[in-house]
């Protein structure tokens, strides 16, 4: 399965390009990529980026696919699925847990559903830490044509496989940690 790392976003809250911000000499996005590489069920890693970011990200040595839609996460997922089924993760999730990725992919394949998404007890979804079938792209295309860019709404409409987060190993939850501000980097150093 493809491991698609979304490298969109403008880093407004962070105050710059957070994905290339260096932590201990290494760009933030590389922490996510390196953890994803150790997931056993990932065959290939691609980066989904805007045209503006593509050249900078190509220097990391991974295949970069350009998201020309620029409509947020839905556009990134849509672009990734043009290459086949994919596990999609945001590039700012440096504590990604490879065993959790493998678990999601296994459950996705067992379920036969279009999407397999972790869900919190309160109903909140983790759509940028989920597995999708390339068939989900057709659903997204309809939404995009209609101007509806809410990824969670599209997911809910396809009767996905939900993974109840509270019933999974607690240590896997660090996988959802994402960096939005420079203060978050402090949490990363402590963790």
Curated annotation (Swiss-Prot):
Record's catalysed reaction(s): Mo-molybdopterin + GTP + H(+) = Mo-molybdopterin guanine dinucleotide + diphosphate
Keyword Metal-binding attributed: yes
Pfam families to which the protein is assigned, alphabetical: NTP_transf_3 (PF12804)
Top-level division of the source organism's lineage: Archaea
Its EC number(s): 2.7.7.77
InterPro entries membership: MobA-like_NTP_Trfase, Molybde_CF_guanTrfase, Nucleotide-diphossugar_trans
GO biological process: Mo-molybdopterin cofactor biosynthetic process
NCBIfam families in the cross-refs: PRK00317.1-3
UniProt remark on domains: The N-terminal domain determines nucleotide recognition and specific binding, while the C-terminal domain determines the specific binding to the target protein.
Protein name as it appears in the record: Probable molybdenum cofactor guanylyltransferase
Organism listed in the record: Thermococcus gammatolerans (strain DSM 15229 / JCM 11827 / EJ3)
Gene this chain is encoded by: mobA
């Amino acid at each position: 399965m493809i491991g698609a790392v979304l490298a969109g976003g403008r880093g407004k809250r962070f105050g710059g390009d957070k994905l290339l911000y260096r932590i201990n000499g290494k760009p933030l996005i590389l922490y996510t990529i390196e953890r994803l590489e150790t997931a056993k069920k990932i065959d290939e890693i691609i980066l989904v980026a805007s045209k503006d970011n593509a050249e900078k990200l190509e220097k990391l040595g991974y295949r970069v696919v350009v998201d020309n839609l620029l409509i947020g996460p839905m556009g990134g997922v849509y672009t990734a699925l043009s290459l086949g089924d994919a596990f999609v993760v945001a590039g700012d999730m440096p504590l990604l847990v490879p065993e959790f990725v493998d678990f999601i992919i296994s459950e996705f394949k067992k379920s036969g559903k279009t999407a397999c998404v972790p869900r919190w007890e309160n109903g909140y979804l983790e759509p940028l830490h989920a597995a999708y079938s390339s068939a989900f792209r057709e659903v997204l295309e309809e939404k995009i044509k209609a101007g509806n860019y809410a990824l969670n709404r599209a997911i809910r409409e396809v009767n996905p496989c939900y993974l109840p987060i509270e019933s999974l190993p607690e240590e896997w939850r660090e996988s959802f940690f994402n960096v939005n501000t420079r203060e978050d980097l402090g949490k990363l150093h402590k963790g």
